[in-house]
Amino acid sequence: MVKVIVLLPRRGDMSPEAFGQYLRETHLPLVTKLPGLRRLVVNWVLPDPNGSPPAYDAVSEDWFDDAAAMGAALASPEGQAVAADVPNYLDLSRFALLVVEEEDVPLPTGSAASPAG
């Protein structure tokens, strides 16, 4: 399984509210049509504890069976529609896309998040 992590900075002329609305109502419906997409998660970035604005507004995680499935999805007509929409809401000078393989790291027994904890 491969995951595409996308760092999503909104365009400077968009408010956070307009960005969220555009992402939810326009862009994500395009992403959900990607062939071979297994899972889609959007993480909304919270303000920094010191009050400074976050560098990114959201981070998306898109899961595919493998790199070939991801490549096929991005090359498909649906993938081309997703790519064509990106400049409508993202600051392309700060946008980043990472292709990763996830590895679960077991926590020590007794830790707060471990099953036996």
Region locations from a protein language model:
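Macromolecular interaction modules
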Residues: 1-117
